[in-house]
Regions:
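Gram-negative bacterial Sec-dependent N-terminal signal peptides
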Residues: 1-23
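A compositional/structural signature for long, glycine/proline-rich flexible linkers
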Residues: 23-506
Length: 506
């Protein structure tokens, strides 16, 4: 009898405990961690999300898919800037009449502020051409002796090869052979050989001034630069040089939803493995796929406009206020480096930390040309860049105010140094009544201080007696500046030489 009663008590107790557990876990048989349960209402930055036992409501699902597509459109904008930028450059050349690799845009009178080029310089004699390896196959580039830093980049602005003083010819001139992607045909001897990952490739050469003039570099291009398909080695097409100096044309990618049309053109042109599956998938998620129509519906058109607007705004935030400490060259100055992390592939800790995507966006929203020679320490050979857009107090430059920059004596630059002013909107040379918004120690006769330093002045009007050292700015327009060091020497790298911050003069 007692035994039966004890069994009955145990059963009742078990049922009560089971009922208690069921109640506390929402009809589950076991205790469920709250961290894996989705509440029926969730407050987020995109609004209130409603669920029924974990299933999103129809309205919530629409909200989430709109947000997902906007995030992807934004990511595509930020990560595909190199691709869109190269396409805009190609189209800019095409509109200037350059459609074949033997046609070279030559800035025989330097690059002034008329064309829209991302932070182009006013200091070297540019020669620019596009290679089409799909049409022409392996292509030969012959460069003359004495060339400055010269580079070939692929259609994603990835490094293919250097030439000239920083290339394997070491400034002695030479013959280069650029092979198409996946090429497995014969490769003749006698060339510096590189294989590109894309059909479209940009050749950009820099010639140095001699006695402040372009003549020597221009003559060198005319007599020594040759670009032709290897298949036409015996009957090379005649070189054509088209002047870009003083011309008005655009080479900058769109900042609105036309951006996606630019990258669609590239995706259709290039081989499928031009970008990796993950990047292809991200781009395909917004409707862009090789060989297929890109026809976004009304909903997606609105999302693409929004994604481009957010991506563009974010790229500008990264450019003007990078949040990584190693963006700044010196602890006590507001000068930023061009290559955050000092790596032309933007790898963190030699790749252990992956790729710094923000640093890559920062660079390509502001600039073009990607080469180790601009990022690595190359004493007396490469080039280094310092960018500044605010005073020591952290105030962005105002084109209606006056500023001063001191360049200390004994500038550690073997070839030359220069300071160029740029437009914060276009990231191109600032357009003023001065055709060249810059000062260059080999071209301009500037007034030195008794200690050998040089004071440069920025403002809408020249300070009295300082006209030779003045760079004009525009009221109600922002600007920033880049200090270039060609052939940088050890004091640049060890920090024993550095420019002042730019200070307001009242």
């Amino acid at each position: 009898m007692l035994k039966t009663q004890l069994k009955r008590v145990a059963l009742i107790t078990s049922l009560l405990v089971s009922s208690s557990v069921m109640a506390s876990t929402g009809a589950y048989n076991t205790d469920i961690p709250s961290s894996i349960i989705t509440p029926d209402k969730v407050e987020t930055s995109i609004g209130t999300l409603n669920f029924k036992d974990g299933v999103p409501s129809q309205q919530t699902m629409e909200m989430l898919y709109n947000n997902l597509d906007t995030m992807r459109a934004t990511e595509v904008f930020m990560n595909a800037i190199p691709m869109a930028s190269m396409e805009a450059l190609r189209v800019g050349h095409e509109k200037m009449g350059l459609t074949n690799s033997n046609q070279v845009m030559l800035f025989d009178d330097l690059m002034d502020s008329n064309p829209l080029f991302l932070t182009g310089n006013t200091d070297t004699v540019y020669a620019s051409a596009f290679l089409d390896l799909e049409r022409d196959g392996p292509t030969v580039v012959e460069i003359p002796p004495g060339m400055g830093p010269t580079t070939v980049n692929d259609a994603f602005f990835r490094f293919v090869t250097d030439m000239g003083v920083v290339g394997p010819d070491k400034g002695q001139g030479g013959k280069y052979l650029i092979l198409p992607p996946n090429y497995d045909g014969p490769v003749p001897e006698g060339y510096h050989v590189s294989q590109s990952t894309s059909y479209t490739n940009w050749f950009i050469a820099r010639g140095f001034l001699k006695d402040g003039k372009t003549d020597a570099a221009v003559n060198s291009y005319h007599t020594g630069l040759k670009i032709y398909p290897l298949a036409k080695k015996g009957e090379q097409p005649k070189m054509e040089f088209i002047s870009g100096s003083g011309k008005s044309f655009n080479t900058i990618h769109a900042n609105d939803d036309h951006f996606y049309d630019e990258i669609k053109t590239v995706i259709d042109k290039e081989p499928i493995d031009f970008i990796d599956p993950e990047m292809r998938g991200l781009i395909a998620a917004i409707g862009i796929q090789k060989g297929k129509p890109f026809e976004p519906d009304a909903r997606m058109q609105k999302i693409l406009k929004d994604g481009a607007a957010i991506g563009n705004a974010t790229a500008r935030a990264l450019m003007f206020n990078p949040r990584t400490e190693n963006a700044y060259i010196w602890d006590d100055r507001n000068w930023k480096t061009a290559f955050i992390g000092k790596d032309y592939q933007w790898l963190i800790d030699e790749g252990k930390g992956g790729r710094n995507l923000d640093a890559r966006t920062y660079f390509f929203y502001m600039a073009t040309v990607n080469t180790p020679a601009m990022a690595l320490k190359m004493i007396g050979k490469g080039s280094q860049y310092a960018i500044v857009d605010k005073t020591a107090e952290g105030k962005f430059f105002d084109g209606g105010k006056n500023y001063k920059l001191t360049i200390p004596a004994n500038v550690p630059a073997k070839n030359f140094w220069s300071v160029v002013a740029y437009d914060t909107q276009t990231r191109s040379e600032l357009q003023t009544s001065q055709p060249f918004p810059s000062k260059n120690d080999k071209r301009d006769k500037m007034v030195e201080n008794p200690d050998g330093s040089v004071d440069l002045y920025f403002g809408p009007t020249a300070p009295k007696g300082k006209e030779a050292n003045w760079i004009q700015t525009v009221p109600n327009k922002g600007w920033f500046s880049i200090l270039r060091m060609y052939g940088p020497l050890e004091p640049w790298y060890d920090g024993s030489w550095k420019p002042s911050d730019i200070t307001e003069v009242k």
